[in-house]
């Protein structure tokens, strides 16, 4: 295997990708009042035209109260928003690309959007709230299938709702959705996955994004040992996850002492399922530097990425900031047009192109 093997096709169930590169989901807040318009379709279409294998959209929210923390985060419900997403799907497919929505509920996130009217402090979800939220995830999954998306991703990472159930620092419940072990705290996620699988059937690829780190705590850990990792991810695979998107700030960092496997490598080793690795691909500094300091990043080679891919640690590679700044990053890498690549600038975050 070699560098060029990253540009080989990937197939899983009905999902067919022209290469191993995935556009990572990145919140843009460019959908006025939750409706993705033509600029959003053009944004994703540019990447499809430039041979990105799979596009994961920014997080798009289910139909539940407080599911988002910004008014211009796209909705994944309602006729107007779904018409907008249908246009996005058709645009990407016309360019030869594949696309999956990242289905999302932010949960308890105090930062961000100020609603137009006051609201009470977040309360613990009732059992009825949980049931209705699971139903809403299933409805969003069915909408993704009906709109012609090639796959879907559930956002279970970075301290948002599904992840808030996983983590013992945010899940203090004393009922069946809480508990002292990660296996107990995974009940909500398992039920969401089962609802999604029931909605889309056996053939549509379901991806789950997960992480150890949280938006508020980069040192956070859900699984501190491989055994705890097994207790975390095996029930999720059994519930219906096809591909795990294992989010790290730096893909080259080992997950546990005694092995250089990263998070994606461990999840693949434990579950046997395909995985996506992510985290500062092609860059020297991680996304934390961007969020905390507004910092850009110089380029970096992908020699270590190739080594880990050759070893079979993961199947797909998600690229975020490089593709945000340069829609043609994948095709430039494919043809080794390295002199055309630029350092990442924080100003790119404010541009939808």
Can you name each region flagged by the protein language model?
Residues 1-353:
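Flavin-dependent oxidoreductase catalytic cores
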């Amino acid at each position: 295997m070699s560098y060029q093997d990253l540009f080989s096709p990937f197939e899983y169930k009905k999902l067919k990708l022209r290469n191993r590169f995935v556009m990572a989901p990145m919140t843009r807040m460019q959908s006025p009042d939750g409706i993705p318009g033509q600029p959003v379709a053009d944004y994703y279409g540019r990447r499809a035209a430039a041979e990105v294998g799979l596009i994961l959209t920014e997080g798009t929210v289910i139909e539940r109260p407080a599911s988002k923390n910004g008014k211009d985060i796209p909705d994944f419900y309602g006729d107007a928003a779904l018409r907008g997403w249908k246009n996005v799907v058709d645009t990407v497919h016309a360019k030869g690309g594949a696309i999956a929505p990242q289905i999302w509920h932010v949960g308890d996130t105090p930062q961000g959007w100020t609603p137009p009217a006051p609201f009470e402090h977040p309360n613990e979800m009732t059992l009825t709230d949980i049931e209705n939220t699971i139903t809403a995830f299933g409805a969003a999954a069915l909408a993704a299938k009906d709109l012609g998306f090639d796959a879907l991703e559930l956002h279970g990472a970075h301290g948002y709702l599904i992840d808030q159930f996983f983590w013992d620092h945010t899940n203090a419940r004393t009922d069946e959705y809480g508990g002292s072990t990660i296996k107990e705290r995974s009940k909500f996620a398992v039920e969401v996955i089962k609802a999604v699988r029931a909605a889309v059937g056996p053939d549509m690829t379901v991806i789950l994004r997960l992480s150890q780190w949280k938006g508020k705590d980069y040192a956070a850990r859900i699984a501190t040992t491989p055994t705890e990792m097994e207790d975390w991810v095996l029930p999720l695979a059994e519930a219906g996850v096809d591909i795990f998107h294992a989010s790290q700030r730096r893909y080259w960092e080992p997950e546990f002492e005694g092995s250089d496997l990263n998070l994606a490598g461990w999840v693949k080793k434990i579950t046997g399922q395909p995985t996506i690795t992510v985290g500062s691909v092609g860059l020297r500094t991680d996304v934390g530097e961007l969020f905390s300091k507004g910092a850009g990043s110089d380029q970096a080679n992908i020699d270590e990425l190739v080594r880990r891919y050759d070893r079979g640690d993961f199947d797909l590679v998600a690229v975020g900031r490089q593709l945000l700044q340069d829609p043609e990053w994948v095709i430039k890498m494919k043809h080794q047009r390295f002199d055309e690549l630029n350092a990442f600038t924080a100003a790119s975050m404010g541009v939808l192109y």
